[in-house]
Amino acid sequence: MRYTYEHMKSMLQGAYKKLKSYYFYDKTLLFIKKKIAEFESDDGCFQQTFDVLAKALISENSAYFEELINQLDYRVFPKRLVAASAPTSTIVGTIDHHKNIAKVNFFIDVPIELLILDCLWTLCIAKISNKKYGTQACSYAGKFKASVFYFDQDDLYEGIDWESNRCFEPYYENYSRWQKDAFSKLRQGLQVQNQLMLSLDLKSFYYSVRFEFDSLSALLSDDSRLSEISFISHVEEKLYLSYTKLISKYKKGINIKNNATIFPIGLLSPILLRELYLYAFDQKIKFALNPTHYGRYVDDMIIIIPAEVQANNVTQNYVCNLLKEKGLIRKEISIQNEDFTFVGFESIAIQREKINCFYFEQNASNVLIEVAEKQIRDNSSEANLLPEFDVIKNHFNDIAYFFNSVGGSTKIRDIGILQSNNYAASRSITLMKQLLKNTYIAEQDRGKIEKFINDLLEFYSGSSAIEFMGSWTSVFELILQLKVLSDDKRKRDPLAQRFYRDIVYYIDYKLTFDLLDPKEIYSKKKATVFRRLKRDLKDRLGTSIAMAMALDYRWKATVSAQKKNIELAKKFRKSNIFNHNLVSFPLLNYLPFDKIATRSLLEIQKEPWSDSGVFSLDTQRPFWTPRFIHLDELFIYYFMQSTQNEKKNFNGKSDIEAIWKRYAQLNSVQRFTTESVAKQNSMELLGVNINLVNVSILNDVPSKYYVGLPNTTVSEDDALQSLVDPAHKMTIHDKEQLFRMANAAVKEGANFITFPEFFIPIVWLKDLTRFAQKNNVSIIGGLRYIRNANRAF
């Protein structure tokens, strides 16, 4: 390859930063998070890997990559669980915790070197594809952040940001926009005539696709830059072909022809290749239907078209016939098969029973739109508010379950099936953890929280634990948080033991393939896949425990694997692959690892750094950060540093400018920032000279301002008592009072919220700064005294 060693190494390191950030936020691929943690555990091997990779690429060392591809393997996890018994007319008053596996998902498992190479190749192909495709408006998933590419540079090295960890836009924002845009276009269409909204999904898309690497040249218009990465493309093709061959031994329906491949779940490249592959597919649908709106999120489509028939004629058959008339689909030959394949994309299919139709009348009150839009708005606004104590006072069961009643009726005869709401359950866990953070849990509160967790463990018992395995880490974090903040001295935690043993028991004795869809796995391979699935589930369980323990090692969750869990937890902490939101003080986990290797990251930092030498950011840890380091975190960090390093005061101008430059450097955003954000002047007020610092604000400012004045006081005794007793007024109730006042002020439209002097503990400041940022408000308040040995600030 034509790149120098220095350029190639820089590109590989940049690619690694981006893949690390992507998997940091991913909740599915815990085995890759573990792979990253183990990769960074040995500093020498970690750095050497980039050297070896760079030299192998420059010399186009095929044997080296052949050896890596030979280590290819797969992971397998449950995709869908179903009830063992057939539905009856009897309404059962309990949740079915005895479901079993109907479908599975396969994930690619490769050495970290191939993950890095895959990310590097993905970035290069994305840069090349920008020239032809730009931003695809109708596709909402897998979008690259605009800052990843320099559009005035065609060169693959100069034209890609290899310094930062930025890569994809947050999935939840695009998913929400996918829904909001659909309803917005629907409203516009209803101003003209009745509208029909169709919801379609592509059947087993990642396994059904037949991608050929030879098609890349045509897809990218024979771009000359493809030749620069032809060797990497060749390695990628061999990897895809090897994985396709491997999975086809187990999963039915993968009939390989020529050099076609499926898309490996677990790599970053399919996110991009999927969009290139479906570009013509999207255009064909838009041309054939001329829809009011067309939006696709991965393999889910929302299509809005003018309604040409009456509501009672809109059925799944009508939709299928319409798509056939437009030349988009054709029925499979098999009489029993209800699948329809897309013309020109014969490997891609939709299922009749999964077609959803919604009819909207032009001049009618379309309540469905209003309810859906309200739900989207509420989810967004709720996420901006601080959690309140209702999350404890309300029983967990009130949140996590609902009846699928007939018409919302409260009559006994209309009560439907009791169902689980995992979204509400997982959200309540997150809110509880945020509320508990940096509080002293009194005995009476501990009992309430234990009741909450016991209800939670009942919710996740039996098959529900397997079905919602994405919540394992979060549950263990909450249990550990309760143990640490309530100063529980017991060696073993009964709540953690219960959760762990319940999961292991179901895996060992209850989980089966008896209900497996006959189209999933070859019968001769079922036993092999099932053994692998059980092994992978147990490995995921151990990884979930270790990720929680990265916050505090003292917790003994299991007996047999205790030493193994702690060793892995240390690796997660060293690589910073764990939940940063629960770290007690901003950027504590970015200090030199030898200084924090054994410290609890959950305990409240009473006198955090009386040893001033500890309080300095590590030189390498921020460089390999998996996330964006926020400006408010740096302000709080450096403010605390000024109190711990015997600095007399915090200089309003020079310190702010220094922090701003540090912020830009840490996040590689120098090209987006201004030279200076702070200007200093002074004025005299009542005979006192006051220094003023003007900080540039780029956000829109309102024409009128409203000030929220919380009705609370701080006594002199309260202010002084916090010096003697750090736990003074640091309970859940005190934190909830602060949060409730802030929420109430925002709901009333306040732009400024003022709290009294000596009111806000500095360890709660991050919650408030993030709240202010999300709600575009300013918070003014006095901090409680800060201790440093025998000094107070």
Question: Over which residues does each language-model region extend?
Answer:
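Phosphate/oxyanion-binding active-site loops and adjacent basic polyanion-contact surfaces
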Residues: 113, 117, 269-278, 445, ...
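Conserved polymerase palm-domain catalytic core
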Residues: 183-298, 304-314, 349, 414-571, ...
